[in-house]
Design a protein with these regions (language model features):
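Long, contiguous binding/interaction regions
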Residues: 1-71, 86, 103-183
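Helix-adjacent hinge/juxtasegments
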Residues: 75-107
Length: 183
Protein backbone atom coordinates (compact mmCIF):
# COMPACT_ATOMS: atom_id res chain seq x y z
CA UNK A 1 0.00 0.00 0.00
CA UNK A 2 1.31 3.43 -0.94
CA UNK A 3 1.74 5.87 1.91
CA UNK A 4 -0.65 8.31 0.25
CA UNK A 5 -3.33 5.61 0.45
CA UNK A 6 -3.24 6.00 4.24
CA UNK A 7 -4.25 9.64 3.84
CA UNK A 8 -7.36 8.51 1.94
CA UNK A 9 -8.43 5.99 4.60
CA UNK A 10 -11.41 7.59 6.23
CA UNK A 11 -14.78 9.01 5.34
CA UNK A 12 -15.04 11.85 2.90
CA UNK A 13 -16.39 15.07 4.34
CA UNK A 14 -18.97 17.23 2.60
CA UNK A 15 -18.74 20.99 2.16
CA UNK A 16 -21.76 21.32 4.44
CA UNK A 17 -19.96 19.37 7.19
CA UNK A 18 -16.87 21.57 6.78
CA UNK A 19 -18.98 24.72 7.11
CA UNK A 20 -20.78 23.30 10.16
CA UNK A 21 -17.42 22.39 11.75
CA UNK A 22 -16.15 25.93 11.18
CA UNK A 23 -19.28 27.38 12.79
CA UNK A 24 -19.03 24.98 15.77
CA UNK A 25 -15.35 25.84 16.21
CA UNK A 26 -16.12 29.58 16.20
CA UNK A 27 -18.89 29.04 18.77
CA UNK A 28 -16.54 27.03 21.01
CA UNK A 29 -13.93 29.77 20.68
CA UNK A 30 -16.46 32.44 21.69
CA UNK A 31 -17.59 30.31 24.62
CA UNK A 32 -14.00 29.76 25.81
CA UNK A 33 -13.17 33.46 25.42
CA UNK A 34 -16.25 34.42 27.47
CA UNK A 35 -15.42 31.87 30.14
CA UNK A 36 -11.63 32.29 30.49
CA UNK A 37 -10.91 35.74 29.00
CA UNK A 38 -7.51 34.47 27.87
CA UNK A 39 -5.89 34.07 24.46
CA UNK A 40 -6.76 30.87 22.63
CA UNK A 41 -4.62 28.54 20.59
CA UNK A 42 -6.74 26.87 17.90
CA UNK A 43 -5.23 24.01 15.88
CA UNK A 44 -6.59 22.55 12.66
CA UNK A 45 -4.72 20.74 9.90
CA UNK A 46 -3.88 21.60 6.31
CA UNK A 47 -5.51 18.50 4.81
CA UNK A 48 -6.32 18.84 1.10
CA UNK A 49 -8.86 16.49 -0.39
CA UNK A 50 -12.14 15.03 0.82
CA UNK A 51 -10.71 12.87 3.64
CA UNK A 52 -9.76 15.14 6.54
CA UNK A 53 -9.66 12.60 9.36
CA UNK A 54 -7.74 9.33 9.32
CA UNK A 55 -5.25 7.61 11.61
CA UNK A 56 -2.45 9.48 9.83
CA UNK A 57 -4.13 12.88 10.18
CA UNK A 58 -4.81 12.19 13.87
CA UNK A 59 -1.11 11.40 14.39
CA UNK A 60 -0.17 14.67 12.66
CA UNK A 61 -2.52 16.51 15.04
CA UNK A 62 -1.07 14.65 18.04
CA UNK A 63 2.46 15.68 17.01
CA UNK A 64 1.31 19.30 16.79
CA UNK A 65 -0.42 19.20 20.18
CA UNK A 66 2.66 17.67 21.81
CA UNK A 67 4.90 20.38 20.32
CA UNK A 68 2.52 23.17 21.33
CA UNK A 69 2.22 21.88 24.90
CA UNK A 70 6.00 21.42 25.17
CA UNK A 71 6.55 24.98 23.98
CA UNK A 72 3.99 26.32 26.48
CA UNK A 73 5.68 24.37 29.27
CA UNK A 74 9.11 25.64 28.22
CA UNK A 75 7.82 29.24 28.27
CA UNK A 76 5.98 28.58 31.56
CA UNK A 77 2.66 29.48 29.97
CA UNK A 78 -0.18 27.84 31.86
CA UNK A 79 -2.82 26.00 29.87
CA UNK A 80 -6.04 26.45 31.87
CA UNK A 81 -8.43 24.68 29.50
CA UNK A 82 -8.22 22.53 26.41
CA UNK A 83 -10.49 20.47 24.23
CA UNK A 84 -10.02 18.13 21.30
CA UNK A 85 -12.48 17.18 18.56
CA UNK A 86 -12.19 14.32 16.08
CA UNK A 87 -14.94 14.72 13.52
CA UNK A 88 -14.98 13.85 9.82
CA UNK A 89 -14.01 17.48 9.19
CA UNK A 90 -10.62 16.73 10.75
CA UNK A 91 -8.90 16.76 14.12
CA UNK A 92 -9.15 20.03 16.03
CA UNK A 93 -7.68 21.18 19.32
CA UNK A 94 -7.88 24.41 21.23
CA UNK A 95 -6.62 25.74 24.54
CA UNK A 96 -6.92 28.85 26.69
CA UNK A 97 -3.45 29.90 27.78
CA UNK A 98 -2.09 32.43 30.30
CA UNK A 99 0.31 34.17 27.91
CA UNK A 100 0.57 37.36 25.87
CA UNK A 101 -1.31 36.80 22.60
CA UNK A 102 1.42 38.32 20.40
CA UNK A 103 4.10 36.16 22.06
CA UNK A 104 1.90 33.11 21.46
CA UNK A 105 1.50 34.04 17.79
CA UNK A 106 5.23 34.66 17.38
CA UNK A 107 6.21 31.32 18.87
CA UNK A 108 3.46 29.33 17.15
CA UNK A 109 4.34 30.88 13.77
CA UNK A 110 7.98 29.97 14.36
CA UNK A 111 6.90 26.43 15.25
CA UNK A 112 4.86 26.17 12.03
CA UNK A 113 7.84 27.38 9.99
CA UNK A 114 10.57 25.36 11.73
CA UNK A 115 9.03 21.96 12.50
CA UNK A 116 9.24 19.30 9.75
CA UNK A 117 5.45 18.88 9.88
CA UNK A 118 4.68 22.50 10.74
CA UNK A 119 3.44 23.29 7.24
CA UNK A 120 0.62 20.79 7.83
CA UNK A 121 -0.51 22.62 10.97
CA UNK A 122 -2.74 25.67 11.06
CA UNK A 123 -2.18 27.17 14.51
CA UNK A 124 -4.37 30.22 15.03
CA UNK A 125 -4.08 32.59 17.97
CA UNK A 126 -7.15 34.51 19.08
CA UNK A 127 -6.54 37.29 21.59
CA UNK A 128 -8.73 37.76 24.66
CA UNK A 129 -10.86 40.29 22.74
CA UNK A 130 -11.66 37.67 20.07
CA UNK A 131 -9.34 39.07 17.39
CA UNK A 132 -7.46 36.49 15.32
CA UNK A 133 -3.80 37.49 15.01
CA UNK A 134 -2.20 37.22 11.58
CA UNK A 135 1.25 36.24 10.40
CA UNK A 136 1.34 39.59 8.59
CA UNK A 137 1.15 41.46 11.92
CA UNK A 138 4.46 39.82 12.82
CA UNK A 139 6.01 40.67 9.47
CA UNK A 140 5.97 37.02 8.40
CA UNK A 141 5.37 36.17 4.75
CA UNK A 142 2.29 34.27 3.59
CA UNK A 143 2.42 30.52 4.14
CA UNK A 144 4.37 28.85 1.35
CA UNK A 145 2.92 26.24 -0.99
CA UNK A 146 3.84 22.65 -0.11
CA UNK A 147 5.14 22.13 -3.65
CA UNK A 148 6.62 25.31 -5.11
CA UNK A 149 7.10 27.66 -2.11
CA UNK A 150 4.94 30.39 -3.68
CA UNK A 151 2.03 31.86 -1.70
CA UNK A 152 -0.08 28.81 -0.74
CA UNK A 153 -3.38 30.67 -1.11
CA UNK A 154 -2.54 31.68 -4.69
CA UNK A 155 -1.57 28.12 -5.63
CA UNK A 156 -4.72 26.70 -4.02
CA UNK A 157 -7.00 29.27 -5.63
CA UNK A 158 -5.37 28.76 -9.03
CA UNK A 159 -5.27 24.96 -8.60
CA UNK A 160 -1.63 25.00 -9.69
CA UNK A 161 -0.94 21.51 -8.32
CA UNK A 162 -2.94 18.29 -8.46
CA UNK A 163 -4.39 16.75 -5.32
CA UNK A 164 -2.25 13.65 -5.90
CA UNK A 165 0.92 15.76 -6.03
CA UNK A 166 -0.03 17.54 -2.80
CA UNK A 167 -0.87 14.30 -1.01
CA UNK A 168 2.36 12.67 -2.24
CA UNK A 169 4.33 15.56 -0.73
CA UNK A 170 2.36 15.41 2.53
CA UNK A 171 2.88 11.64 2.78
CA UNK A 172 6.60 12.08 2.09
CA UNK A 173 6.93 14.66 4.88
CA UNK A 174 5.06 12.50 7.37
CA UNK A 175 7.09 9.40 6.43
CA UNK A 176 10.38 11.27 6.78
CA UNK A 177 9.38 12.71 10.14
CA UNK A 178 8.20 9.40 11.55
CA UNK A 179 11.24 7.56 10.23
CA UNK A 180 13.60 10.11 11.82
CA UNK A 181 11.70 9.93 15.13
CA UNK A 182 12.27 6.18 15.21
CA UNK A 183 15.99 6.34 14.34
Amino acid sequence: MKSTDLLYQGQAVTLEEMLQARDKRAAKQRQALNCYRLPLISLTLVAPGAVKNSAVWRRVADYAIAEILALCEQKEWVNVWEMQVNERSGPEWMAAVCAPAMALKQHMSTLEMSHPLGRLWDIDIIDSDGKSLSRRELGHPARPCLICQQDAHLCARGKHHTLDLLLDEIARRIECYERERCD
